[in-house]
Amino acid sequence: MMICLLWISVAILVVIHWIYKVNKDYNILAFFARRVQTKDGKPLDSLVPMIKGRTVFANCFDLLGKDTDQVFTHLRQLAKNSGDSYLQYSMGFSNFNVIDAHNAANILNHPNLITKGVIYNFLHPFLRTGVLTATEKKWHTRRSMLTRTFHLDILNQFQEIFIAESLKFVSQFQGQNEVVVSLKDRISRFTLNSICETAMGIKLDEMAEKGDRYRANFHIIDEGLTRRIVNPLYWDDCVYNMFTGHKYNAALKVVHEFSREIIAKRRVLLEEELENRRATQTADDDICVIRKKRFAMLDTLICAEKDGLIDDIGISEEVDTLMAEGYDTTSIGLVFGLMNMSLYAAEQELCYQEIQEHILDDLSNLNLSQLSKLNYLGYFIKETMRLYPSIPIMGRQTLQETELENGLILPKRSQINIHVFDIHRNPKYWESPEEFRPERFLPQNCLKRHPYAYIPFSAGQRNCIGQKYAMQEMKTLMVVILKHFKILPVIDPKSIVFQVGITLRFKNKIKVKLVRRNCV
């Protein structure tokens, strides 16, 4: 009996010793998350705040039971309480949460940190591995291929589409001198129409019903993604599909069918153009060589397929990615931009007077050159995106042990969360950060500020290739609306309930009142 107890005691001591030894390198209770080290061996908490978890399992279950709006509030509170970029251990990962510009600059420019975080894996059923979610060689190839499609010459040719869609937007209120507008649905229809006609070369006039179905099912997909983000139990594909995945998968089918139809229609149009050129004896065997007019992004992909640079699945990946990004993120910027126009009458008047100075009432000179003269409108939009960034959080992960400038050594598979929302409201860079002040973006004020204190389009290697496109689209719609209407407030911005998500989500119906200018 004594020998048996002795062996049990030895076994217990061995296990305790093993746990002690392993726990130096791994946070065992965080499901063996490998620990972050410091370059000079200093205590970790001397370099970065450590967030204590709700349970003994580190931060694994901090979000469990919280709604999407509660998670959003929780993240903002963590940033406020820590006062600096902070560290968590959760579900087998170390998580470095960045809320300062210096660390953001280091990470976004680090040559080994181009791979998106594991959360982006939840996007793979929707976007697969297009330019947003791809990494390493595939990302470099796709990025190079797509960047040329946002060249200034091509953006110039898109302007007539933005004007036409903007006029179509205001024509919805023809015959109405005053109207209260719920922005989200109407603006998202405008941005979807615009991205389809510019980047895809397809008008949605005859596909309006299918476009509405796309938007409705996009919303279902977005809700499904958000549900997975906040509930670690749903991180496993099998568990998620078993309990709540059928609705999500049905929505995926609808949006993928829509994008495939867009691709098929564009292929037909390109072939018809080739036939027309043959008929007029100006034909060349290669439609990609002879085409001199507007060159939609989808055309570039179809031509790259002919050269063996991409296949049909690759085209679908990029079409789904560009449609989602171009439709959703710009829509968010416009919703909050128009809301702010309604809230800040003096700033709205400055925008209007600037527009009147540079843009004719018939819009005949509403081109890129004239848009570039609307400096105050640009500051207004930038300040809107500071307070309400379309992408409130960006994720990266380490593929190997990585040393940062701040002295932290992140182990392989560490997750890095760059909280754009908090950087944009960090009092270190922004005086009275909650106040709306477009003059923050005057050139002399920007010079005093860290360049990575404002990153609504990301920055560094993986910055948004469509940021000029987005600014052009937002400016054009705002010009057309302000030419026709004065925008009055309906909603109190303090009542807005934000929700966590890949993009900035909110529960409220954000509304404004449009009053026709000749009736004011």
UniProtKB/Swiss-Prot annotation:
UniProt record similarity statement: Belongs to the cytochrome P450 family.
GO cellular component terms given for this protein: endoplasmic reticulum membrane
Named cofactor requirement(s): heme
PROSITE patterns (alphabetical): CYTOCHROME_P450
Naturally occurring in which organism (per UniProt): Drosophila melanogaster
Binding site for heme: E325, C464
Compartments, record wording: Endoplasmic reticulum membrane; Microsome membrane
Enzyme class (EC, first level): oxidoreductase
The entry's keywords: Endoplasmic reticulum, Heme, Iron, Membrane, Metal-binding, Microsome, Monooxygenase, Oxidoreductase
EC number, as in UniProt: 1.14.-.-
UniProt-recorded Gene Ontology molecular function terms: heme binding; iron ion binding; monooxygenase activity; oxidoreductase activity, acting on paired donors, with incorporation or reduction of molecular oxygen
Physiological role: May be involved in the metabolism of insect hormones and in the breakdown of synthetic insecticides.
Family matches, as Gene3D superfamilies: Cytochrome P450
This protein's name: Probable cytochrome P450 4p2
Annotated membrane topology: Peripheral membrane protein
Matches recorded under Pfam families: p450
